Amino acid sequence: MSACQTPLIVALDFPTRDAALKLADQLDPALCRVKVGKELFTSSASGIVETLCAKGFEVFLDLKFHDIPNTTAMAVKAAAEMGVWMVNVHCSGGLRMMSACREELAKRSGPQPLLIGVTVLTSMEREDLAGIGLDVDPQVQVLRLAALAQKAGMDGLVCSALEAPALKAAHPSLQLVTPGIRPAGSAQDDQRRILTPRQALDAGSDYLVIGRPISQAADPAKALAAVVAEIRG
């Protein structure tokens, strides 16, 4: 059973290992998991994941792999060997790519990370999709990619909370991971399709990714406790 008692994932979106660990040391692994993204992972290499795991955190490795099937599957395998709790790939890589990742993880005898698909980035709106040749609403593209993810045997999806109700209705077995979460009164920053933590959970999200409202707070531990209180109502 997970040591974490909440659905919260704090994004360690920092340029250096020291800055990320400084924040992590102010957080309680029982109250949140942590997310390691491209900037931190690239600047710190794989050691950051092992260090966070040693501190008691479950780690979401948010690298959004997208490549040919074998290359992506090997990257997912490497992530699993690091001990990550969750890893993601772009659904737009296609059915064969996602299936290859699922099949590679199935070969493992030890713990398997949750394999999550990225649908449409929360910063993208219809005009952004049109710019890459997809003249559809984000919600339509999300549902298309979700169907592929379900067929490939993925564990869940990264999606906006605004898409969560439709996704839960269409694919109730998929776990939904929602970025762009902002507690009431927070700035939107560069996330467009957002909801508050309580709204996101009520909409069907299973895990909530929160970054700047906690990482840039004067007292991150206090900010985290406030979000926990908000979702527990």
Swiss-Prot record:
List the GO biological process terms. 'de novo' pyrimidine nucleobase biosynthetic process; 'de novo' UMP biosynthetic process
Coiled-coil annotation reads none
Kindly name one Pfam family recorded for this protein.
OMPdecase
- The domain of life is Bacteria
Record's catalysed reaction(s): orotidine 5'-phosphate + H(+) = UMP + CO2
What keywords are assigned to this protein?
A: Decarboxylase, Lyase, Pyrimidine biosynthesis
PROSITE patterns per the UniProt record, alphabetical: OMPDECASE (PS00156)
Pathway(s) annotated for this protein in UniProt? Pyrimidine metabolism; UMP biosynthesis via de novo pathway; UMP from orotate: step 2/2
Which of this chain's residues are annotated to bind substrate? 13, 35, 62-71, 122, 182, 191, 211-212
**What's one GO MF term for it?**
orotidine-5'-phosphate decarboxylase activity
UniProt GO cellular component terms = cytosol
Active-site feature positions: K64
**Which Enzyme Commission number(s) are on file for it?**
4.1.1.23
Q: Which PANTHER family match?
A: OROTIDINE 5'-PHOSPHATE DECARBOXYLASE
**What role does this protein play?**
Catalyzes the decarboxylation of orotidine 5'-monophosphate (OMP) to uridine 5'-monophosphate (UMP).
Could you say which protein family the record assigns here?
Belongs to the OMP decarboxylase family. Type 1 subfamily.
Query: Subunit info?
Result: Homodimer.
Instruction: Specify the protein name.
Output: Orotidine 5'-phosphate decarboxylase
The taxonomic lineage of its organism, from the top, reads:
Bacteria, Pseudomonadati, Pseudomonadota, Gammaproteobacteria, Pseudomonadales
